[in-house]
Amino acid sequence: IPNIFCCPVAAEQIRRLYNTEGEIGTNIKRAAFDRSSRTRSGRLKGSGRMVTQDWGKAGDYTGISAAAFFDITVSPAAKTISVTADDNVIDYLVLERDGGKLKFRVNANSTENISVSVTVPASASLREISAGSYGKVNCKMPLKGPSVSVSVSSYGSVSADIDTPGAAKLDVSSYGKFAGSVRCSDGELRISSYGSAQAPVECRNSCKLTVGCYAKFSNDIKASDLTVEISSGASVGSTLTADALTMRIDSYAKFSGTVTVNARQAKLTVSSGGSFNGTFSGSSLEASVGSYGKIYLKGAAQVADATVRVSSGANFSAPELRVSDYDLTVSNYAKADVWCSGRLKINASTAAKVTYGGPCTVETVSDNIQRRK
């Protein structure tokens, strides 16, 4: 082995340092690249003249991390790691192996107009992807580990399909983006701070979706037990299918789409200017809307029973939903518009307003309760 601790090593010599598994010893790799100690003190500006280096085999790895403008493609067709970058930038690029995770970064205090493209051979053990600081990862193979975690932040983006027999975790924040699909036993999806995710989700057991701070989620979700929390101006446009559903919407957040609850009860809570606008079908409904929140349920599905609380300037509207029995409480300048075929029990304060339709029996009658014409 050449005296790599004293002089720079050419790309061909770097390739020879790889063992049969594609791994480089940490100390040798640092010295060979002379990169960990080689840090650009001033601004590193890309020249626009692109060169490509072969960094040898990747070996088996469980995670991959992209940061600082790295554009990484995980390809089943690739045999070795291929790196393309500006000719004055490529010597400041670093690949570290940390506990089975490949970490790509650039050793510079600041950068300008750099372009780094990396192709990495796929690993069957890959189960963790992270991207931040405008980094990108495009994984062209499904992530099939026993559990899978994907994290995207700071304008990063990840494109990947998750197909695991275990748990899946997705965390997208700070203008990060995720596109792909999720299949798992139990899923936890958190989208926040202007992040966005477009992914059909199918969980055999439970799924929890949390969307906040002007973030966005779109596509279909199927789960046995589904919890959805939307807050702080966030929005969800989706078709939700579950055996049991709990949904909370507040702080001017929005949901639009379709909700189907196959077996047990759907629980909807909307407050603080939040809104639910969608088609609903299910056997039982429990809804609470307050503080100028809005629930507008479309469709004429058959519902056995519904318990609804409307307060503080809120609005509940389900004029076509075919509910057999209603238990309705409306107060403090709130409004409700419902359809009922059986028993309609109403508790309405003097400042509230209720309109109804259907061949129902109304248990409470007052001036602020009126049949629709």
Residue ranges with predicted function:
Residues 4-153, 157-173, 177-212, 216-231, ...:
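Acidic (Asp/Glu) and glycine-rich low-complexity loops/linkers
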Residues 274, 293-300:
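Histidine/lysine/aspartate-rich catalytic loop segments that bind and position anionic ligands
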